């Protein structure tokens, strides 16, 4: 009888601890679709390289610019900051009220990177930058570049070091 009570007590104790732990863990996760961090007035993102209409080699450097906001890594909840997301050949924008998914077409730069080496197949491509907050959710209002079009060609001239 004492053994059963002891086992029941231990079982309830373990169950209670699990429920409390689960509640604490979910408190640290960003709410999905419930909040968008405000962006600074006049905030913008753009490409330093490449530019719209450029012909680039299959492997090339993409450099991001941000104005009016600071850069902070994903997970760092700091007002007026965020990090870049690169949209590659995206024809339909994702839901701006939800965290951006990480896919081959939506690249996350959650460490605060402002440059990346990109390799694309030859042909026409589009690139667009989207700035998002600590939880990968776009700001409100959205801070997004215009879409640029580039052509990837093995015959592209090497980048001019003076232009970068």
Regions found by a protein language model. Give the residues of each.
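Short, compositionally biased P/S/T/A/G/V-rich stretches that sit at domain boundaries
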Residues: 27-57, 160-164
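Short, well-structured beta-strand segments within conserved domains
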Residues: 60-64, 114-116, 123-131
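Short amphipathic, basic-aromatic surface patches that mediate peripheral association
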Residues: 65-76
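A beta-strand/beta-hairpin structural motif
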Residues: 96-118
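Short beta-strand elements
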Residues: 141-163
């Amino acid at each position: 009888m004492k053994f059963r009570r002891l086992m029941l007590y231990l079982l309830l104790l373990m169950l209670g601890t699990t429920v409390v732990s689960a509640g604490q863990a979910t408190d640290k996760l960003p709410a999905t679709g419930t909040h968008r961090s405000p962006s600074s007035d006049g905030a913008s993102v753009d490409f330093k390289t490449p530019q719209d209409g450029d012909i680039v080699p299959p492997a090339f450097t993409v450099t991001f610019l941000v104005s009016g906001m600071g850069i902070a890594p994903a997970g760092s909840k700091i007002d007026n900051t965020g990090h870049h997301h690169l949209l590659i050949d995206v024809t339909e924008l994702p839901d701006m009220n939800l965290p951006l998914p990480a896919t081959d077409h939506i690249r996350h730069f959650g460490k605060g990177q402002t440059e990346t080496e990109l390799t694309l197949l030859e042909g026409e491509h589009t690139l667009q930058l989207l700035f998002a907050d600590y939880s990968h959710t776009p700001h409100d209002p959205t801070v997004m570049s215009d879409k640029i079009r580039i052509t990837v060609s093995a015959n592209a001239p090497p980048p001019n070091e003076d232009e970068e």
